[in-house]
Amino acid sequence: MMKVLVVVALLVTLISYSSSEGIDDLEADELLSLMANEQTRKECIPKHHECTSNKHGCCRGNFFKYKCQCTTVVTQDGEQTERCFCGTPPHHKAAELMVGFGKKIFG
């Protein structure tokens, strides 16, 4: 039974990894606009750091590239601004948890 769970976890991880790469390819047009504005950076943005000005500059985690996650913040003046940070999406967290659990069990 545990072998089946580990195989399923590995399949979920591989599918999530390939889908994250596919999503990155779909966002290529946004990347081209960033390159046109010469905002490319050689250094990546670490996890939990702000990525508002460079939404494609997040570093790579253990298994997946961090994604720039944005929220709308309302200031005391009532102005709405968008704030973004590099983080791990929930489905990537679940896949990493399953792989980590499998590594602890099977060495």
Curated annotation (Swiss-Prot):
The keyword Chloroplast does not apply. Disulfide bonds join C44-C59, C51-C68, C58-C86, C70-C84. It is found in: Secreted. Residues 1-20 form the signal peptide. Residues 21-41 form a propeptide. Pfam families: Toxin_35. It comes from the Eukaryota. Expressed by the venom gland. Keywords: Disulfide bond, Knottin, Secreted, Signal, Toxin. Belongs to the neurotoxin 19 (CSTX) family. 04 (U1-Lctx) subfamily. This is U1-lycotoxin-Ls1e. The lineage of its organism: Eukaryota, Metazoa, Ecdysozoa, Arthropoda, Chelicerata.
